[in-house]
Every structure is written in structure tokens, then in C-alpha cells.
Amino acid sequence: MTHQNTETASLATTKGALEPLPPDKTAGLSTGAGHEISSDESEGSEEETGLHKDPSQRQRQQNATFQAFLSHHAETIVNSPVKPNQAQSELSISSLIGRNASGTGILNPREYQIELFERAKVQNTIAVLDTGSGKTLIAVLLLKHVIQTELIDRANGNPPRISFFLVDSVTLVYQQASVLRNNLDQNVAHFFGAMGVDLWNKQTWAEHFEKNMVIVCTAEILNQCLLNAYITMQQINLLVFDEAHHTKKDHPYARIIRDSYLRVPPSSRPRIFGMTASPVDTKGDVLEAARNLEALLDSKIATTSKLTILRQVVNRPNEEVWIYDKLQPTFTSDLYKLMESRFGDISHLEPMFRFARHATSELGTWCADRVWVSALADDVLPKVEGSIGGKRQSTGLGQLPKDVHRDITRIKEASELVESHPPNDPGAPEALSSKVRVLWKEISQCFGQETNTKCIVFTEKRYTAKVLFDLFTVLNVPGLRPGVLIGVRSSDRIGMNVTFRQQILTMVRFRTGEINCLFATAVAEEGLDIPDCNLVVRFDLYKTLIQYVQSRGRARHADSTYASMIEKDNADHESILVQVNDAEKIMQSFCQLLPEDRILHGNDDDTDAVLDREEWEEPYTLPSTAARLTHHSAITVLARYASSLQYENDTSAQVTYVVLPVNDAYVCEVILPEKSPIRGATGMPAMKKSTAKRYAAFEACRLLRKHRLLDEYLNSVYHRRLPAMRNARLAITSHRTNEYKILPKSSLWNKQIGVIPGKLYGTVISLKPLTPLAREHGSMILFTRDRLPQFPTFPIFLGEDVETIVLTVPVNMELQPSADELDYMTTFTLRIFRDVFRKTYDKEPEKLPYWLLPAISFPCNQEADPRDVVNWEILSSVHERDDIEYQADMPPEMLVDRFVYDHWDGRYRYFTLAVDENLQPSSPPPSHVARRRHMDTIMNYSISLSKNSRAKFLSRCNWNQPVLHAELVRLRRNLLDRMTDKERKLETRSVICIEPLKISAIPAAIAATCLAFPAIISRLDAYLIGLEACKKLGLEISLEYALEALTKDSDNTHEHRSQQVHMQRGMGKNYERLEFLGDCFLKMATSISLFNQHPDDNEFDYHVNRMCLICNRNLFNSAVKKELYQFIRSRGFSRDTWYPEGLTLLQGRDHSKKIGSESKHALAEKTIADVCEALIGAALLTPGPQHRFDMGVRAVSAVVDSNEHNAASWRDYISLYSIPKYQEQAPDGSEIDLCRRVEEKLGYHFRYPRLLHSAFTHPSYPSAWARVPCYQSLEFLGDALLDMVCVEDLFRRFPDRDPQWLTEHKMAMVSNKFLGALAVKLGLHTHLSYFSSALQSQITHYAEEAQAAASQSDVAVDYWTLTQDPPKVCLPDMVEAYLGAVFVDSNFRFEEVEVFFQQHIKPYFHDMAIYDTFANRHPTTFLHNKLTNEYGCLNYCLKAGEIPGADGDASTVLAAVIVHDTILTTGVASSGRYAKVKASENALTELLHIDRNEFRKRYQCDCVQENGEHGERDVGTPI
């Protein structure tokens, strides 16, 4: 992928990736299975159906810190304290259930319950009791007993164990947890899938197990915990199975028993207690089903032996049969005909058409027409429209096609039609069916008078319940207050999707009497705490014994009625009545006739049979944790692993199974998502396709475990291993952390110090102003003990900020000075320090590191004799006289153009300009001159003496001497930068008398140049230090680039557009641009090296190994090892430290202590790492001996310090590469044809056609068909090559742009959006080999859109910015893989990559201004820049995770900005994308008026890494 590389920093610093959110909002964990129910089919609660959703939609790379916060947030929602007066509508589900539980919530046992409890204490038991008879209390009693025993065992030192209360729906989780909390004094936790429990790790589970004695959860949660070895059977003391009749086939109840319970020794098994109203829920042999249930649960059915006592507690209702006349055949109403004629072709309305037609017979025309009113109501219409668009988008079409917009428009028209259609009168003939009329009649009789009747009407379909509710609302039966209770279903097409909260609120209203007639589906049959009714009506007849028993159990009120509605002369209905009655009698007889000891013959054999049926399924057990992998669970484990590879906006990371017939059997190949290190596996042959699929999944899981990509709990390690590597790049701090030794001066100055030099080497220094200077500056020659290199030119700023180029010319011939010559040279050099800089040194030529002398004025060349270059006349003049003494009879013109200085005050140095005949020494100074203490006369103004000395001098001085105009020399020494405003404001015009001052023997032109010498020698010294750094690394880099790479001119140099902190003036260019270039070359060089040295590695290993090489931590460690920190220039010009060291100072301020105090500098670790990359960039700009990248290659080897990259030249890459077998194999006809076609399009001829075949082979393509590797390795290489060619182009074209601008515009050139459009433009998309129907659809639609946009754009080269994003996992990768293939095929000629760039990419980017806004102003991008650049914080992340609706509503997504483990802000939305935007926007608002210091104080931001290790940290995927 182009810029989702593992080494690219995302918004995290423990930087985690910004993880995607599961689109599946249903509860539970996935077993890899699932089914789809049409919205108008039989009612089935979807509360636990979510357990069977594919978990590949789930994200499993959550940061541990965020996960804890997310869990806490969800728990807070569910368990938040309830205010006494808080409205019911504001309560959470737990609070609603807790507040409105029937009775007080304190249960008292009855005799038969105690009897069953005693039995359950000593043996595994299935309690078969009627609904309402108190099975839950027996479970509570048993739990109390088990907890008491457990506490005793723990006190005796036994390992702790806990109890599990397993239920089959999410609503029951809430309800049973509330009951247990009201009856147990121990901690009770409740969990279900939508709480994100499938994302928890062992540590999280261990914490819950440790602090809770009982856990109420849906069964699949425990099943997965057992399979993942988060808990073992030995750690469980009791398993309670609510509604135990579900234990059959592959239900999680059955899987827990088969996969975990029966596989441990009997002595280690927990007690089992099952509860059900009937042990069977299917048609067929009742006794056989009961025995099977006993075998599956390893338990014995038990019921009370005192049924008379039970009858006293559970009132059996009076059973009635309501007979209605035979229904009419289905027909079509007028509204139906009208709707069908105009909108019958809209597939989304098909369920409504089907139900409306069926309802004409079952319910009548009023109800049939009413479904349209409900389905197309104003409040439902937006949901319908969203469902249409969402369904189309879920098929991978991306943007909505025109036909979807058309359907939405027509749906609105249909709604308007229904609204305008005159409603029928429900009392009219044929308006209601005979069945509904009977219901109306009977209910009217029950509610016609003042009564306390409570009624539940059971229907099979959701629509039926809703329409009957609407009907009885319209009929306005006296005393009737109707309501509707249906199951949770997120995919209902007509907006009838209800939430857990709505369910609970409806039951609360029913309990309080606000509703007294519920029209309900099967959701009201089982488990829910619904108060006793005195009328239960089966509008749609039950079909199984369990439905009959459970719905009858709702009629528990005294003198209640249970009515079954049957059609007159309907043999099927009459048969069901007989069958259910017979089955109940048989079941009762079975229970009553069981022997007292409840021993069933053949139980052991039955248990063995359960295991024998899965004998082929030998589990793979991990010894360290006892986690088990079975063939059945392998599919779930594999799906969970695949989902851990998914990132935001990626296509779904799903597992692909390819089943092929082989020798009268089936063999399955499993193909893992593209990002998986292991591509897949092939299973053993099997006679059934489903078995072959399990075999392949099992082998793939074993292979993943072998490569340690599944941990010891069978969870993906990606959420730990990959982000740790992704974060390596940012695993060091950007801020000041340590003090490092700094090299104050080049070691060249110390060579041969202490001896009189026998030979010296000269370097001529001349100045070339860009505009004329106000005064002449003479040339100088610098003699040193060692030869100086050729220095680059550099600017200084003289006079009134005139930019002046410093030219240096090294003289090849050495100078062997005589003793006299050396004496003259020493005298002049020391005179400069005294007169110009007020430092008087002892005359010790053996200690001088250099000699600064005047040069002759004619141009000098390198071959000149240095003796001829020196102006010996000036040296002689200076040597002969200390100063030019002022004489009263001196001609005034001799005083002009002199350098004069105040011997007593170093602030006053002047260049004399002219004599003013109009002024006298006694005249007051002109008003424009700078203010001094004595302004009465010019003579007094010119003196710096003390009071007494001043009086003496004034009494004897010459008051008739001339007055001169002079230029005051600014104290400014840092001529490497322009003047500051303060310096510019200094008044330099002055008037002086000469007598109080000293006239230097140094000519004014030479003195002027000497004033610039501190800046010049400082810059030359910096170049020499850069040269030393390069020599230490074995590099030959241009001094200009070497110094630039080592220059850090502020504390936050890397923050390109932020205000620079502690800015050092005049240091020249800093390292930031070179670091940008070097970073890119480092990525390319290490990619090539790894590709060549490890041809068999997969893309994952390449990314991880490259990250280990190029991460800042590795660069930092390597730099510290080589002591590169001492060469970094972090300080600008110093007026105190430029003087030569070691000389004996006789007069003047001593700066030696200052030099000692600046022996160290504070550097951030990241700065040191950045300098390494900048040195690579500098080496890259220095031509190599054979290839222009040679020096860059050598620099990479020097800074990464690893055997993974030890190349010394570009040629070494070629010698490292061993051609793989597939590349050399003879191509077949299709491969030759592919090369020919691609050559016609792109112009490159492949020597190895199979390389091109590999470049166009998608990872989804089965290896059995491909015969070449997929493109991942070539794409890894091509991605780095493309980055390099784009960066190099921008770097050279825009020399003044900062790295942030370069990065933003490079993003356009290498973006998936552009590369996808380019692939289509070049026609590459037609050559891709893949095996994915989703990809086929995505490529087709994207190509059509891209081609249309290109054809309509005329000459606009940025047309691609207006298209949708391309399929990310193929088209952009194709371009990069093609570049990688060309590079390898051409024997590593980078020039071929440049040719492709010039021909096919650069034409789109000649005018980069077009893309100024491409890096859009996204809140998350801005937040990232603000935190890193403005605040300098690196320890932050943006995380998002799904949480269950606080009250069972649709799941929401919570995003949080975390700074140093503090939740800065959060955002909640329906999707991860918008939640992150909200959180980012809130964070930007929060930080709006906070400066850097306040931020660091408030969030304790120091960004200091406690250690450099990256352990098993679950950090996530960067922004």
C-alpha cells in the first residue's frame, strides 16, 4: 500500500494506528456461521443471532489503555447510579430491570424448590418446571451453596473458581444479572457480545474473573473463553444453563460440553444445573429427545415429586379454543393493485407486497393496507431510504448509482400515494378476516367493562403484531390499552427495528398497567420477566411443545385463560392440539416414572457417543495454556485473526476458501487477507466440502501458530507485534532529554600546537559584496599549521546589511617562514586581537593555531607563492610602530580613513570619515549623535576617562585640533545573519576628537575585514567539524551539505511551520530538508537490501525488518555509538568562544570559563536520529565515484550499522541479488502475450516475463493457479522506489520549500487515489489476476468512473481528485509492483523508474499549485500537527471502539483523544469515521487557547521514554 506503510507514523506516539470499527452492530461473538431471515418471515429473536456473525468485521488491535477506558465507559453506561426521581425513559436497561423487577427481587424458596436444590447439590441436574414455577430461585440457592463452599476452599488454600450463569439472549443477560444481584452478596458481572468482549485479552478476563464470583453471559462468550484458554473447566465450579432445551447440535451450550467439559477428567468438572419448562423444543420422539438432552448435558432430568404443591404455586390456566370461520383465499386490495402497478419493480418493497397479499386472507383488507401506512410512514421513510443506499454500498459499489437515487425518489412517491389513499373502515364488510373478528369479539368481552385484565396475544410474524396493534388502537375498545412487543432485529426493512431499551420500557409499561394488552412475537415466550396475565391468546398457533408450555406459562394469574385460535375444519390445527397435548402427557409421565436415584441406563455410552461423533476432530492443544484448537473452532479463530489485519477504510479482511475436487474427494485451500504474513494453507482431502474447509482452516491455524502469529491463547499477535514495530519510528522523544558532549572547535586547530611551525598553509579570504559597500574591505590570508580544504562560499552581512559572499582560495604551495617573517606575522595577528577586539595576548607563536595577515589586492590563484600573496609592507609598518601617535601638527588629511579606538572603553571604535571645518572641540555634539554621559563639548564627548583623569586631560589637551566625522563601529559580531531591529536602530554617525583615542597602525580596509573575521572563522570552523564527522563515518560529502546536515538551529527545528524556539541566528540552512530527502533514500536503500538478501521473506517480514533498520531508535543508538552527537551544531555564533584557545591573555575579558561551560549541549534523541537521515541526504547530493547514489548507499550502511545493509556502493545491490527460480523459468504463451501488451502501453520490454506476471497477481489468487508469487514483495520494493523518485523531483524543483510542503505535495503523487486512476489510465487494471467477486465489482465500477472523469476533464490533469477512492488492495499496488518488477528486471537501474516517472506521472504534476489543498484540512490531520509541531508531544493517540447502546439501542462508536494516558476529549457517533472527527474537533476546541507551557503542565507532558524496549504493547494503527 502506498502510504499506509508500517513505518509511516499514524496519529499516535505510542502512536497507534487509527483502528477501523466493526460495521456489524449485533451482539455476541462469531462462530463463523450465520443465516439470513427475510424480514417478513417467522419471528426469531436476533438478540443472540449476532453470535453467529462473521467476526472478520471486528477490529482487534485496540490499545490496552483505550480498551480499559472503553470498557469502563460501557460499564458506566450500563451500571451508572440511578437517581431516585430519574425518568424511566432516561434509565439504562440494568436500571430499568432493577427498578421494575416484579416483586421485591428477594425470593423465598418453596418445598419443591428445596427438594430440587438438594438434588442439584450432589449431581448434575436438569430442572424441568413450568414457566413461573421458580427455576431461577433454585439456581440462586445453588449458587449460594457453591459460593459458600468456594469461600471455604479458598480459605484452605485451594485455587479460586467461579460460577457461570449462561443464557441464550442479551435481554436475559440483563434480567438474570439483576435477579442474582438482588439475591447474592457477591460480585456479579454480566457480559454479552456487543460489549466488545471478543476484543479483550487474557489479562482483561483475568481481572473480571478475579473480582467476580458469578458471571452472567451469553453462552458463546464462555465457549470462546474456554477455547482461548482464558479460563479452564477446572477454574469453574458451577455451570447454570438457562433454557437448557437449546442444548443440541452446534448451539454454544452443546459446544461448551463437547469441546471443553467432556474433555477434562470427571473429578475436575464443574457442577451443571439446567433449567427448562420442557426438555424438548422440536417435533419427534419426546423420550428420545429428553434422553439426548441428558446425555449432552451429562445431567439427569428432575422435576418436583409433589405436583400438587406446584399447582398451588403455578396456576394452570383454563384452556379454551377459539374457532374462526375458514379464511378466504388471498386476493389483492385496491391499494395493493395501485402500488403494484406503479412500484412493483422496487425490490426493497417486495416483503411488504408479499405480506400485504398474505394479510388479505389472514387479517383482512384493512390490515393488508395498513402495512403500507406503517412501512412508509414519515418517521420510517428515512430509515428505508438509508437501508436502500446502505445495502447497495455494502455490495462494494461505493458511491450510490443512479438507480438507487431513483428508487429512493420512487419510495417517497409511494409514501405520498399511501398517505393520500382514503383509509378503509375497519367495521366494513370484508375489512377484517374472520380470524381477526373473533379476536376483536373475545377481547372486547374481556375488556368491555372495568377490569384488571392483562392480555398477551402471540403472533408468529412481526408485521402481524404491529398491524394488530394499529387495528386495536383504531378500534378503541373500551378499557383496552394496546402495546406491541417484538424482538430486536437491526435489518428490518420497514423500520420496525426495536432496541433492548424499547423492549424493557414496553414490559415496564405492561407491568404498571399503562399497557394491558400486548401484541407480541416469540420474544415474549421465553425467559423475559413478564408479569402474570389472566388472558393469553395464541393468535398464530404454536408448533412445538416448548412454545406451548412457555406461552401457557404466561397465563399464571388466578382464574386465567389460555386461548388457542384454530380455523374451523382445519385438520392441521386440530392435529397440532392433539400432538402437543400427547407430548406433554408423555413428558410428564417420563418425569414422574423416573427412578428415585435418577440413573439412566447408557448415560456413559451416550457421553462416549458425543465424543465419538467428533473423533475425527483431534484437537490441537497448546501445552502452555491448554488452549484447544478444534476443526470446528478453527474457522472462528481464523476469521478473528483475519479481522485483526483490517485497518480503517480497508476492504473487509475476510478469509477466502477455495474448494476443488481432487480424486473423488475435495481439497480446500484457504487464502488469508493480503496483509497476513502467511498467505494460506491447504487442508487434507475430505469427502464433504464443509469438512475440507474445516481441515484447511485447521492447518492454517496451526501454521499461524508455528510462525507465532497466533499467541498461546489462539489470538492474533498483530495487535501487539505489528504496532510495536510501527511505533519504532516514534519510540524516542523529540524534546530535550540528555546533555551530550559538543565539539566546540575543530581538532585541526590543535595539530602541532606547542611547537614553532616549520611550514604553514595559506587560504586567501576575499569578500564579494552583491551591492557596493560604504567602505573598502581588503583581502586577507589565513595561515594554518595544516592544510585547509576548499570551503564553499557563504554569505555574511556587512555595513547596512549588504549581503557579501566570502570566497576562500587555498594556496597549494606551503610557506616555510623564517624566524623574522614568523615574528612579523605573529605581531600583526596579535595586533588585530588588541586593536580590533580589545584582547592583548602574550607573544607565543608556538601556541598560535593560525595567523591572519593582509593580502595583496590582485586576484590570487591556488598555484601562487604564498609569500607573494602576503602584503609584507603592511606587516612591516605594523611591526615598527605600536600605534600612530597623534601630533598637533599632523595634517588633518592624515587623520581621515583611519581605524581608531578608545583604549579605555572597548565600545568605542571608529572609522574616520572627514574633517569638519565648522566644528571645534569646544562645540557641543550635533543632536543626531548617540547619547553619552558628557554632551557639553565634542572633546568631553570623546573621552572615556574617570572624573579626575578627565579633568587632567581636559586641562592639558589641544583645544584647537580638528573635529572629525566618524562611523561608530557596531558591537555586532554575528555578521552571519542580518541585523536585528535593535542593532539597526543604533546611531553610527558620530563626531570625535582624535587626541583622546588611539590610531591603529592597521589600515582601515584591513581592519574592516578583520571585524568580519569572527563570523568567517566560526563558519570555517563549523565546516571543518562537518568534515570530521564525515571522516568518522567514512564518507566524502561536500562540506556545504555536511554542515547543513549537522545544523540544528532551534529547539524545534523539525517543526517546520511552528514558531522556532531558541532560534540560533546565522547558522545557515538547517538539516530539515536533507533529513526529508535522506529519510526517503534510507527507506529505498534498506528495501532494496532486504529484498535482495531475503528473497523468500513475505511482505510482513520486509516491513518489520525494514522498520528495525530505519526506526529512530536504531539510528539514535548507532549515532551514539559513533559519538555523532558531538559534531551537531546546535549553537549559533558566539562572540565569546571564537577566539583561539591556549593563548596567555594579558589584557581584556577572559572567555575561557565561557568555553568550558559550553562543553555540552542538550539534544533530543530524535534530533540525533534526524541528523543521521540528514547525513544520508547530504551524501546523496554528493556524486559517487561510479553511481550517483554510491555515497548515499555508503551513508546508509554507516548509520544503520547492521548486517542487513552493509553495501558500500550501488553495484553491491546487484551482486547481492540471486535470481529466484520462478523468474528464470521459461514463460508460457499467456505471459509472453502479457509482456507484449504491457510493452505497447508503457514502452518497457521485460527480459523476464514472469516478473511481470508476478507483479499483476493479487494475493487473493490461489497459489495452485498462479504459479508465481503474488505481487506483495514487488509492491514493497516499488513503493519505496516510487517515493524516492517523487521526493527527488520535488526536492530539486522546489529548493525553498520546507519538508512539510514537500510531504503534503508528495502525498498527492503517491496517493492511492492517484495511483488507482493512473492504473486505469494506463490500462493496467485489465491485467490483474485475482479471485474475489467483491474486487471484480469494485474494479469495474471504479474503472468506469475514472474513465468517465478523464474523458470529461478536457485538459484538467487533476480530474482524478474528483473520483471516488479506488479499491485499495489492488490498483495502486499494481503500479508500485510494476515499478518493482521493472527495477529488478533492468538489473536495478533506477533510471528506468525515472523514465516511468517522467513519462507517466510527472505530466500530472507540472503545476503543483493545483494540489495545494490536496492534503485537506481534516480535523484529525490538524490535531496531529498541533500536538506534534506546536506542543511537541509524542505520547498521544486517537482511538475508537464500538460500545453497546446504553439501553440496548443501536451500537455507537466512541472515539477518544488520549494524551499521556489522560482522556483529552471524546466523540460519539454512529461510525468510527465521524466519532474520530468529533473527538478531534473537540480536542482542537479544548486546546484553542492553551500554549505550549500550559499544555505540558496540564498533561504532564515530558515525552520521555522510560525505556527503549517495545514489549508486548497493544497500541493500534496510526492516523
Swiss-Prot record:
For the Dicer dsRNA-binding fold domain, which residue ranges apply?
Answer: 634-724
Q: Where is the composition biased (Acidic residues)?
A: 39-48
Residue span(s) of domain PAZ? 882-1001
Q: Which UniProt keywords apply?
A: Antiviral defense, Antiviral protein, ATP-binding, Helicase, Hydrolase, Magnesium, Manganese, Metal-binding, Nucleotide-binding, Repeat, RNA-binding, Zinc
Residue numbers binding ATP: L129, D130, T131, G132, S133, G134, K135, T136
Residue limits of the Helicase ATP-binding domain? 116-297
Q: Which residues form the Helicase C-terminal domain?
A: 431-601
Q: What is its EC number?
A: 3.1.26.-, 3.6.4.-
Motif mapping: DEAH box: 242-245
Biological process terms from the Gene Ontology for this record are: defense response to virus; regulation of defense response to virus; siRNA processing
Q: Where is the composition biased (Polar residues)?
A: 1-13
**Chain spans, region Disordered:** 1-62
| Superkingdom of the source species | Eukaryota
Sites where the protein binds Mg(2+):
E1275, D1373, E1376
Family of the protein in this entry: Belongs to the helicase family. Dicer subfamily.
Protein name as annotated: Dicer-like protein 1
Recorded source organism is Aspergillus terreus (strain NIH 2624 / FGSC A1156)
